[in-house]
Regions:
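A domain-start/cap signature at the N-terminus of enzymes
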Residues: 21-62, 132, 161-176, 318-325
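Short beta-strand element of the alpha/beta-hydrolase
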Residues: 59-71, 78
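Alpha/beta-hydrolase active-site loop
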Residues: 122-152, 172
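Primarily recognizes the serine-hydrolase "nucleophile elbow" in alpha/beta-hydrolase
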Residues: 147-201
Length: 325
């Protein structure tokens, strides 16, 4: 009986300590969280609210952007504080903290048909969607400039991630403001805007599931982006539907770390002035070629083993994470 009481007391003390630690962490995040809203000039999406979470050190060495599935600013705030009942981003926030990155987050608002790609829209539909989201991208950029001017946010070299509808938003934003981004990971996006040449300046990680309803649309984006010489790491996970898993997250973070290392290398070669990696050169010299349909990797010299439609150059640092089943 005494042992049971002692164990219960220890368990209670541990629970209280963990709760206190979580509350302290939440309080620390809350005290650093900065909110800024920008008018979009759209009637059905009048205002974009951005949240900035500086690193504990105060001076960020980079930026991780989170495009979130959140209907309003309160939900974005709850997700960042870890109090949301819908979504948790502790792994992304931990990734940022470990690398001394600031976090910029917002709620994704849909202005397009989530069940269609650019190549399934009429010209009039595409024109309207483009015009509307151009205004959103302008508002987003105005918010970034505010954070840069008033809170020391770096001007470029950003990482960005999003899933589902938030990935659709992230992909469209990256195509409109590629100069801000170093690498983007979009998962189960299911709806894509048309790739453009200026989008080849950043590293794309595009993941989905073979059982996901938008699987074919994701493959079409991969082929179109690759044919514009965009550096792209594409992976469709067998058996996966409209969901994520640890391997998806690991591949995305591996792409981010790879991009950060190449960014640091390019910056060093540029005398310390921030410089983007030469992705075209990096990918053209990759030693491996992947078959994205049959989930196989070959030496680059055996590229003829892979049909052109499924062929993807794969840098060596990403091979292990891409091959994980």
């Amino acid at each position: 009986m005494i042992r049971f009481a002692a164990r219960a007391a220890i368990a209670l003390s541990l629970s209280l300590a963990l709760a206190a630690h979580a509350a302290g962490a939440e309080g620390g995040v809350s005290s650093r969280l900065i909110e800024y809203s920008v008018k979009t000039k759209l009637k059905n999406y009048e205002q974009l609210t951005l949240f900035l979470l500086p690193p504990e050190s105060g001076k960020a060495e980079g930026v991780l952007c989170l495009s979130l599935l959140a209907k309003d600013p309160d939900e974005v705030r709850a997700q960042l504080l870890g109090t949301s009942e819908r979504h948790s981003h502790h792994r992304a926030l931990a990734f940022a903290a470990e690398r001394n990155l600031a976090v910029v987050a917002w709620g994704a608002h849909r202005l397009w048909d989530p069940s269609r790609n650019w190549d399934e829209l009429s010209r009039a539909e595409a024109k309207k969607i483009d015009a509307d989201f151009d205004l959103v991208a302008n508002a987003w950029d105005a918010g970034i400039k505010y954070f840069a001017k008033n809170h020391g946010l770096p001007a470029g070299g950003y990482l960005m991630m999003g899933s589902s509808g938030a990935a659709q938003y992230a992909q469209r934003l990256a195509l409109r403001r590629p100069e801000r981004f170093l690498a983007v990971h979009v998962h189960i996006a299911s709806s894509f805007d048309v790739p453009v040449k200026k989008g080849a300046s950043l590293l794309w990680c595009v993941t989905t599931g073979e059982n996901e309803l938008g699987y074919e649309r994701t493959r079409r984006f991969f082929r179109a982006a690759r044919d514009l010489y965009s550096p792209i790491v594409y992976k469709a996970y067998p058996g996966l539907g409209h969901e994520g898993n640890a391997k998806v997250t690991a591949l995305g973070f591996a792409c981010f770390d790879y991009a950060l290392s190449e960014y640091a290398r390019a910056t060093k070669l540029n005398g310390g002035k921030p410089a983007m990696p030469d992705w075209a050169d990096i990918f053209s010299s990759a030693p491996s070629v992947a078959d994205v349909f049959n989930q196989a990797v070959y030496s680059k010299f055996d590229y003829l083993c892979v049909p052109v439609e499924f062929r993807m150059l794969l840098p060596e640092p990403l091979r292990a994470k891409w091959s994980a089943e």
